[in-house]
């Protein structure tokens, strides 16, 4: 009888911890990682319109500052992407999210990234991603009240996974898969006016300013941010 009670209490305790882990997410950087993040030599200056101007000693420092500024502006969307990359969308979005989790596994995204990560990415690119991840992780460490799920820390491999998974979607892979599994007839040419409307504001604008037209005589390139992605 005592053993049964002990097992029951242990089970209740385990379930309680599991539920707390899901519904009360938190993230604390180790002292070593916190020290590394805070040693970054970067300045984030926001102008009159709130646009961040980032100055870093190295490209990796600038990537760190960019990630922190991104997190300040839209940590919610960044988390949605991280949750997707970590194959936890089902916990946040239910059935629809679980489909995404399955699709990542079915396409062997992690397997592909693990196979080519070391050989296909230069040290410089890896340093950029490390800096960017540090920026996101520091923001998460400082803003636990904004965390949706326990998906931190973010690692450089996670960034690559996101690119490998999402890039084919730009070319219509998601629509082809939907048509395949739902046995729908493949639509003919689709006009922009008939495309499915997104519930979020959409913007996909990029433009450049030549030295002849800029005030300081320098070329300027505005990032195509693909909102809400």
Where are these predicted regions, by residue range?
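Substrate-recognition/specificity elements adjacent to catalytic centers across diverse enzyme folds
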Residues: 17-228
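N-terminal hydrophobic targeting signals that begin at the initiator methionine
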Residues: 1-2
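Hydrophobic membrane-insertion alpha-helices, especially the h-region
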Residues: 5-20
